[in-house]
Amino acid sequence: MEPISHLVKSSLPNYLSSLPVPDSLGGWFKLSFKDWLALIPPTAVLAGLGYTAYLAFCPAAQCSAKSARCNNHIRKHEAKVVDMIDVEDIAEKAAFCRCWKTKNWPYCDGSHGEHNKLTGDNVGPVVVSKKK
């Protein structure tokens, strides 16, 4: 407990009192390069605390359940989208969509390509083929 007490009662107040914080607005323009470097650590700590508080308490920073959806337009009236495709009906091979962006559900039409370019993602189709 003694190191924490020393930090709070002695080290931290000494550090804060030694910071080159000017008394007036014009004083900020008279700070040297070394003074600006000394102000970086406390500024970074305050920015980190502010950002953490923003993420914790601001509703706009939290993800909503609606934006977490992967299916935005395919058969939304159904509770669960399920397609049964008989393997015997596949001629040589078939590409099935995994990204929910296709207009030709359940088959892939390459809509994931634009999504991959925009987001840097690597999603692709599931390709099912017959053994030869």
From Swiss-Prot:
Residues 59-132 are cytoplasmic. [2Fe-2S] cluster binds at residues 97, 99, 108, 112. It is found in: Endoplasmic reticulum membrane. Keywords: 2Fe-2S, Endoplasmic reticulum, Iron, Iron-sulfur, Membrane, Metal-binding, Transmembrane, Transmembrane helix. Its cofactor is [2Fe-2S] cluster. GO terms for cellular component: endoplasmic reticulum membrane; mitochondrial outer membrane. SMART domains: ZnF_CDGSH. It is a single-pass membrane protein. It comes from the Eukaryota. The chain crosses the membrane at residues 36-58. It holds the Pfam family MitoNEET_N. Belongs to the CISD protein family. CISD2 subfamily. This is CDGSH iron-sulfur domain-containing protein 2 homolog. It comes from Drosophila grimshawi (Hawaiian fruit fly).
